[in-house]
């Protein structure tokens, strides 16, 4: 594409326009109608064809029908709510579980004030922020894995 859109510098009129700074409008392939009428529909229709083709070749199978009289032993939330579910499931006092969940946003709001002395943007030169981030990430992963396990194995992740 770069070679096709290069201006012809042997043309004296083009060189004069380029010298005046007017060259970007006078050479190459115009956006209207070429891009908007020909290339964009091809890309859009190609994307739709890929999605429809994948849906036809590998359809998502429907699960069993819901049976209101056969409740599972433990109802799990969606995967992104596993850490919160694990906190509420493990902590004996539910009010304490809610209080622990409010500590997460409060802790995140305190990080800029704790590390206000550090002027670096590089994460490796900000040890407090990196420690808070890595600890929070590891605790979230730990709680998420534990929520998928039965309650008796959830704290040890079934390792002990």
From Swiss-Prot:
Its main location: membrane. GO terms for cellular component: plasma membrane-derived thylakoid membrane. The chain crosses the membrane at residues 36-56, 95-115, 131-151. It is a multi-pass membrane protein. The keyword Ion transport does not apply. One of its GO terms (biological process) is photosynthetic electron transport chain. The keyword Phosphoprotein does not apply. It is found in: Cellular thylakoid membrane. Pfam families: Cytochrom_B_C. Belongs to the cytochrome b family. PetD subfamily. Component of the cytochrome b6-f complex, which mediates electron transfer between photosystem II (PSII) and photosystem I (PSI), cyclic electron flow around PSI, and state transitions. NCBIfam families: cytb6_f_IV. The 4 large subunits of the cytochrome b6-f complex are cytochrome b6, subunit IV (17 kDa polypeptide, PetD), cytochrome f and the Rieske protein, while the 4 small subunits are PetG, PetL, PetM and PetN. The complex functions as a dimer. This is Cytochrome b6-f complex subunit 4. It comes from Synechococcus sp. (strain CC9605).
């Amino acid at each position: 594409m770069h070679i096709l859109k290069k201006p012809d510098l042997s043309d004296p009129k083009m060189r004069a326009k380029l010298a005046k700074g007017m060259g970007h409008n006078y050479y190459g392939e115009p956006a209207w109608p070429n891009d908007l009428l020909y290339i964009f529909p091809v890309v859009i229709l190609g994307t739709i064809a890929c999605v429809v083709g994948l849906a036809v070749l590998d359809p998502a199978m429907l699960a069993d029908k819901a049976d209101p009289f056969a409740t599972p032993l433990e109802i799990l939330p969606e995967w992104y709510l596993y850490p919160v579910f694990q906190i509420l499931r493990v902590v004996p006092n539910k009010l304490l579980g809610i209080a622990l969940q409010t500590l997460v946003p409060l802790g995140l709001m305190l990080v800029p004030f704790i590390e206000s002395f550090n002027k670096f943007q590089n994460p490796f030169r900000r040890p407090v922020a990196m420690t808070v981030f890595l600890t929070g990430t590891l605790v979230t992963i730990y709680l998420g894995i534990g929520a998928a396990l039965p309650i008796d194995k959830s704290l040890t992740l079934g390792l002990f």
